[in-house]
From Swiss-Prot:
Lineage: Bacteria, Pseudomonadati, Chlamydiota, Chlamydiia, Chlamydiales
Location, primary (coarse class): secreted
Function: Effector proteins function to alter host cell physiology and promote bacterial survival in host tissues. This protease possesses deubiquitinating and deneddylating activities.
Transmembrane segments: 36-56
UniProt keyword Protease, yes or no: yes
Region forming the signal peptide: none
GO molecular function: cysteine-type deubiquitinase activity; deNEDDylase activity
Organism name: Chlamydia trachomatis serovar L2 (strain ATCC VR-902B / DSM 19102 / 434/Bu)
UniProt keyword list: Hydrolase, Membrane, Protease, Secreted, Thiol protease, Transmembrane, Transmembrane helix, Ubl conjugation pathway, Virulence
Name of this protein: Deubiquitinase and deneddylase Dub2
Length: 339
């Protein structure tokens, strides 16, 4: 009997596939193209996910964006552009406004300097303007005694009377802070701002009453910071009616009474923003507007002011630099004389 020989057990050997990694430089042309396509595909997918995330975030922030106002990105870009255009322009406050109005009085003679000791706000400016114009009317007809005449602390009653008699253009500046909702709150905010030495949310706007031209002109360098142009027009139309009664038109005995008492014209000097975001140049813009008005009351602001922010800034910077030295003669805040 022959022995049985069992065959040796068979073993399975698995060969591990060899993986060779090559650098992009050493890879074949087909491999390079494949890798580039994959990379671009991943970039596109990543960008899509990012955009989806931003869209979802915008939906979450919809209420916040509605409160803050539209075009936030545009405003941020404008502010960045303003920061990059150069050093900040000087801040012109009430003293600068007074000094410049004195300079204009010396040049044009028919301008009454701005009374900075009697602050105007949106709550009292209509009454204050009417009182000033009524005082001029009574002075013209010698109905006001020297003792009854209210005049600024840095001006004598005699000099103030002479200035009133010779003036026909009356510029008024109004101080505004949007956080104040009453006259008392506005004055308190004004004192706090002056004490802190910071501008905060404060803003200057200009009202020009021209008796000869029979016109009331309002200028806001931010266009709608105090109120919308239409709202300001409605308020000024009430003032225009009062001024028409104080200063009726000249006419003969047979002139129509209603025509003689016709209201002054109302002009909104700016329907676009000329003050760039992030700048505190409202005072300087008020002075520039007054200078242009005295040269030509019918001038068009949009024709004077460049649309490019850098050019607009350069224009105002040139105005400030050429005016500050001449204004310095009135640094004592004493009113100019008519002698």
């Amino acid at each position: 009997m022959e022995p049985i020989h069992n065959p040796p057990p068979q073993t399975c050997s698995y060969s591990r596939p060899s993986t060779t990694y090559t650098s992009f430089k050493d890879a074949s042309c087909d491999t390079k193209v494949t890798r580039i396509i994959i990379a671009l595909f991943l970039i596109v997918i990543s960008c899509g996910l990012i955009l989806c995330a931003y869209t979802f975030r915008d939906l979450l922030d919809a209420d916040y964006l509605a409160q803050e106002g539209p075009q936030q990105a545009t405003k941020l870009l404008q502010q960045l552009d303003d920061v990059l255009t150069g050093p900040p322009l000087p801040i012109w406050d009430n003293e600068h406004l007074f000094q410049f109005s004195c300079l204009m009085q010396n040049k044009h003679r028919r301008v009454l300097p701005i009374d900075i000791c009697n602050p105007l706000t949106k709550f009292n400016f209509l009454e204050c303007i009417c009182n000033c114009l009524m005082t001029k009317q009574s002075v013209n007809v010698n109905e006001t005694d020297m003792c009854e005449l209210f005049c600024p602390p840095t001006c004598t009653p005699e000099n103030y009377r002479r200035l009133l008699c010779t003036s026909s253009v009356f510029p008024f500046v109004m101080w505004h802070d949007p956080s104040a909702d009453t006259q008392e709150a506005m004055l308190t905010k004004m004192d706090q701002t002056m004490s802190s030495g910071r501008v905060g949310n404060s803003h200057w706007v200009l009202v020009i009453v021209d008796i000869e031209y029979r016109c009331v002109t309002f200028f806001d360098s931010l266009c709608d910071y105090v109120a919308s142009p239409q709202q300001m027009r409605e308020q000024l139309e009430g003032l225009a009616v009062s001024l028409g009664a104080i200063y009726p038109k000249e006419g003969g005995a047979d002139s129509d009474q209603e025509e003689l008492l016709s209201p002054f014209q109302v002009r909104i000097g700016s329907t676009v923003k000329v003050q760039s975001p992030g700048e505190f140049t409202c005072g300087a813009w008020c002075c520039q507007f007054l200078a242009w008005y005295l040269e030509n009351p019918d001038f068009d602001l949009e024709e004077k002011v460049p649309t490019n922010p850098s050019e607009r800034r350069a224009l105002l910077a040139d105005f400030i630099s050429t005016t500050e030295q001449a204004m310095s003669r009135y640094s004592s805040l004493s009113w100019p004389t008519t002698d």
